[in-house]
Amino acid sequence: MKKSLFIPLFIIFFSAFCFSQENKNVTLNIRVFLQGPYSNYSMSDELDKENLIPLSQPYNVNPWGYNGNEQVTKIPKDIVDWILVELTNDTNRSKIISQKAAFLRVDGKVTSLDGKNSLTFENLKEKSCYIVIQHRNHLPVMSSHSVDLDNEVHYDFTSSNQNAFDNSLVDLGNSEYGMISGDSDCNGEINKQDFRVVASNLLKVGYENADLDMNGVVNILDYKIINGNLSKRTAVR
């Protein structure tokens, strides 16, 4: 009788142990620059200074359709904008494992909602994944290789073009690299349609996707960004 009870109890205990081992919290220490607001080793936080950054994450619309409830009562200091961080399957890069909206700081650090600490993903089962960074008017980028999901991950998109899949970063000078600006219609490609979006929003002040240098106003400088990146497209999915 005792022997028959021991076997199922052992199975239950062993299964619970394995489950706890498989699920883990992983902290991502990521650095990434956006071309639009970049200047001399850092990015401008003009949108924050003008109180234009929304308190809730802006990626709940097409093409992202992210339904996360990230929001704050006040934008932390030195924040450039919201970004969307995705973890994708290491054998099927189009399959999203997990997503989180986060803040991007002027020094390129991706932070949690406090604007200080690194972003943490909870209850991950996968052993490795690709890291994807999405922004509302820059071309998405993906890590050049899958990363091991240890308790803490370090990945720097700013130090080399080879750190992005298909070398899809722009040279910012100063031996630094960033995400390509100009995708004002958020379709993953910079083309004539992006000119039309800027034209239809010309001189608007606010949190606009057509504001490609992210200074708070849509103007001729945004045309120049599109012109410099014309025909470029994302390598993500």
Residue positions per predicted region:
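Bacterial Sec-dependent N-terminal signal peptides
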Residues: 1-28, 237
